[in-house]
């Protein structure tokens, strides 16, 4: 692997799946992976884990006050190798109230404080953690974020454009985002999806907590990863209207 080795957690998750089906691999050093040839996959019973990258939107909703008793998140493995599992610890470090339960977590409202957030192994969390930072007291720094520029959109530039449209104080460099918490927020023109499912969902979270109603053009981008996102949002009591124009 050529350095810098970012998103290592995705490699570890793949290796865990290989082992589950009988294929062995081992690290010789931090950057060298050895996979012996001639191995055969073996059948196995496998349970598909819940996705922490999608859970993150509802974890942030719970931390910022959605749901009268908080938001209960089930169907995930707290010991998962998924890098996006870091969202739980990030919210805790910023002051969030999270109770681990047998099948997941209960996330409850808390006063959030600014944080220093390393996105090297969890870049997909960038958009929704930017929304969390917009509601935290002080200036948050999201760093090792350069991979966000080569996702479905330039997630640094486009998240900045949309959050600033809503009144969020944010600036960025090639690899970092700096966000000063505040609110309430409002946009006086439609927000844009940039054909990016995670930007749509992050903006929906922003709209649901501490923001005037938002119109998000191109919201159908959620079909890529979470077609039922808006239905699940409605189940938490968030008002969602689908515009046909």
Task: Describe the residue ranges of each PLM region.
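Short, structured segments at the rim of ligand-binding sites
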Residues: 1-245
């Amino acid at each position: 692997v050529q350095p810098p080795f970012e998103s290592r957690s995705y490699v570890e998750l793949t290796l865990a799946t290989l082992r589950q089906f009988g294929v062995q691999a081992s690290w010789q050093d931090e950057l060298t992976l050895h996979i012996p040839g001639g191995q055969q996959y073996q059948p196995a019973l496998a349970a598909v884990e819940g996705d922490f990258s999608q859970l993150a939107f509802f974890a942030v909703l719970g931390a910022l006050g959605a749901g009268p008793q908080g938001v209960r998140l089930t169907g995930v493995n707290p010991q998962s190798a998924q890098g996006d599992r870091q969202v739980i610890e990030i919210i805790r470090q910023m002051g969030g109230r999270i109770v681990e339960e047998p099948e997941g977590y209960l996330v409850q409202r808390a006063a959030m404080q600014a944080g220093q957030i390393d996105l090297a192994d969890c870049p997909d969390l960038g958009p929704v953690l930017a929304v969390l930072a917009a509601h935290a007291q002080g200036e948050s720094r999201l760093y090792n974020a350069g991979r966000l520029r080569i996702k479905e959109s330039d997630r640094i530039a486009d998240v900045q454009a949309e959050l600033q449209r809503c009144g969020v104080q944010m600036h960025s460099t090639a690899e970092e985002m700096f966000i000063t918490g505040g609110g309430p927020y409002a946009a006086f023109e439609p927000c844009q999806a940039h054909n990016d499912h995670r930007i749509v969902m992050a903006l929906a979270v922003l709209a649901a907590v501490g923001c005037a109603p938002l119109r998000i053009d191109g919201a159908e981008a959620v079909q890529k990863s979470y077609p039922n996102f808006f239905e699940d949002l409605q189940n938490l009591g968030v008002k969602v209207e689908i515009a046909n124009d």
